[in-house]
Regions:
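Short hydrophobic/aromatic-enriched beta-strand-loop microsegments
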Residues: 59-64, 140, 211-215
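Adenosine-phosphate binding glycine-rich loop
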Residues: 188-189, 194-240
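Glycine-rich phosphate/diphosphate-binding loop of Rossmann-like nucleotide-binding domains
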Residues: 2-5, 83-157
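Rossmann-like adenosine-cofactor binding region
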Residues: 132-210
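Generic beta-sheet signal
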Residues: 11, 63, 122, 157, ...
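Short, charged, surface-exposed secondary-structure boundary motifs
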Residues: 19-21, 69-76, 130-132, 151-152, ...
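Phosphate/diphosphate ligand-binding glycine-rich loop within oxidoreductases
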Residues: 2-82, 199-201
């Protein structure tokens, strides 16, 4: 926002706000809206951005709502796929990891269904994609070996140990993308990750020319700048 000539009112520590006194989210949003032209909201509770948007007189940008959605990440992910693979033909995209709690894959799966994309989903038992986000054409696996050679995009996301039940803890570390997988993968495929990573994506793959996750991260700045421009200017063309 600053690079675009605007300013930011950061609120990272709620102990200094009325939230610490018991103020509800809706009243907090009404207060912040009186000082700003837009609110970027990250909240631990699923659905928080929708509640905020229902009462806010200014635009709400959802920067992540618990295990719900992460729309701006999905937009930069879509841009990355468009730039490195293309969306003008039928492509295959693999989503791997904790698909139950991974808000980035929730939003991305919604966007990809607007294109000619077949989704391949790889997750530990108990961490599958929520049923409302699946489709009968999806391919579902428990091992990446079953589909790594068939896909154009390998989108890896971490198992979120802070959110999973104790009986699923043994899944940690079992869902990794390895150099051995990439031997089987297409030469034109790409590796993506929303970051941060833990052990599901080893640094030994960073030098693989198919690894685009650091570029993906950099695109985030430009895509989010474009979102602000779209909100604040009617004259800016908005298309991929």
């Amino acid at each position: 926002m600053v690079r675009l000539g605007g300013s930011v009112i950061p609120i990272n520590d709620v102990s200094f706000s009325s939230v610490s006194k018991g103020e509800n989210l809706e009243d907090t949003i009404r207060t912040l809206a009186s000082y700003s032209d837009c609110i970027v909201l990250r909240h631990p509770e699923k659905g928080a951005a929708q509640w905020a948007a229902a009462v806010s007189p200014v635009p709400i940008i959802n920067a992540g709502d618990g295990v719900g959605e992460h729309p701006t990440q999905a937009l930069l992910d879509l841009y990355t796929i468009q730039r490195h693979v293309g969306l003008s033909r039928k492509i295959d995209v693999c989503l791997m990891g904790d698909l139950r709690h991974g808000r980035t894959v929730h939003s991305l799966s919604r966007l990809l269904r607007l294109y000619d994309v077949r989704l391949h989903m790889v997750s530990p038992p108990g961490l599958e994609m929520p049923a409302e986000l699946t489709h009968k054409t999806d391919k579902v696996y428990t091992s990446l070996d079953e589909c790594v050679s068939q896909v154009d995009v390998i989108y890896v996301t971490r198992v979120q140990k802070e959110r999973i039940a104790p009986n699923l803890q043994n899944t940690l570390g079992k869902y990794q993308l390895t150099p051995e997988h990439m031997i089987k993968a297409r030469g034109t495929s790409i590796i993506m990750h929303p970051l941060p990573r833990v052990d599901e994506l080893p640094s030994s793959l960073d030098s693989d020319p198919r690894a685009v996750y650091f570029k993906q991260m950099r695109y985030g700045l430009y895509v989010r700048q474009a979102i602000f421009l779209h909100l604040f200017s009617n004259s800016v063309p908005w298309k991929f």
